[in-house]
Design a protein with these regions (language model features):
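Basic, low-complexity segments
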Residues: 1-16
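Short, charged/polar micro-motifs that form catalytic or ligand-binding hotspots
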Residues: 15, 30-34, 47, 111-112, ...
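Electropositive nucleic-acid engagement tracts
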Residues: 16-22, 28, 32-100, 218-220, ...
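A short, surface-exposed helix-loop junction/capping segment
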Residues: 20-27, 163-164, 189
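Short, glycine/acidic-rich beta->alpha junctions
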Residues: 36, 71, 117, 200-204, ...
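Electropositive, glycine- and tryptophan-enriched low-complexity nucleic-acid-binding patches
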Residues: 55-59, 112-193
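Active-site-proximal, Lys/Arg-enriched surface segment
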Residues: 60-145, 149
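An internal, acidic/charged active-site-proximal segment
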Residues: 153-258
């Protein structure tokens, strides 16, 4: 088993410029696979025993210069060959947190807990077939409270951006847009899958569905029970203003379909 893991690590970490980066990448991967709930550097280093140099692992994760996109691309190529995917599945996962030190942690809804709670949220892209699936691309969702350009910015959270290593140019992006960005990235790796599957968190966004159509991608997505639709030829109009109260908003001429 260890030999197989070493072969896998050698393949996905091959783009790293230095031998020590490849070595600590493999050790970090082994640490993630060890028993134990906490996957931060210090407890993983303790579980790894002689191989677990806490300082070296922390340097690899936080400051060593390597591009994660190169690792994700090699993982995607390997999984594409193994899975032979028929669909891309998008989902988001909550990582429950007790404190507020982690990057992008905020009180937000997550299906992991089934409620609004303190957590990070990650958006993931999975290659999927009838037999198997694997996550090959992912993004950490940055809430508006962490974006200094947002009117909903929280000064305390914005002040933690530097300590958390969040680049200045990174701001709030809706989850459905992160999903479209990941489609574009996987296509740049040469992976073309013509079907997307996602739940209502993505399907309710008309811009997401339009983005899929612009990319010539078929889709099966969930929508909420309150979603309405109009015939393609329908055009909204503004009723006459009676001179009192707020001006009327645009309405569609026919009853919506549900």
């Amino acid at each position: 088993m260890r030999g197989e893991l070493e072969d896998f690590a050698a393949e996905v970490f091959e783009p790293f410029a230095r031998n020590d980066q490849r070595r600590w990448g493999q050790v970090y991967l082994r640490g993630l696979l060890t028993d134990g709930q906490r996957k931060s550097v210090e407890p993983m280093a303790a579980r790894l025993g002689e191989d677990g140099n806490r300082q070296a692992l922390a340097h690899f994760v936080t400051t060593s210069p390597w591009d994660p996109a190169h690792v994700r691309a090699r993982l995607a190529w390997r999984m594409e060959a193994a899975i032979r995917p028929r669909a891309l599945i998008f989902d988001d996962t909550g990582f429950l947190k007790d404190g507020n030190a982690s990057a992008c942690v905020s009180r937000q809804y997550t299906g992991t807990a089934g409620k609004v709670t303190n957590c990070q949220a990650g958006v993931s892209l999975h290659l999927a077939s009838d037999a198997a699936s694997a996550a090959v691309d992912w993004r950490l969702f940055l809430p508006e409270s962490w974006d200094p350009a947002s009117p909903k910015a929280d000064p305390a959270k914005v002040a933690r951006r530097t300590k958390c290593g969040i680049p200045e140019e990174v701001g709030h992006v809706e989850k459905w847009q992160l999903a479209l960005d990941m489609i574009d990235e996987t296509r740049s790796w040469g992976i073309e899958v013509p079907l997307v599957v996602a739940d209502g968190g993505y399907g309710d966004a008309a811009a997401f569905r339009l983005g899929l159509e612009e990319r010539a991608v078929d889709y099966v997505v969930g929508i909420s029970t309150t979603t309405t639709a109009q015939p393609e030829a329908a055009r909204p109009h503004i009723p006459p203003y009676g001179g009192r109260g707020p001006r009327p908003q645009p309405v569609n001429p026919s009853r919506p379909m549900r």
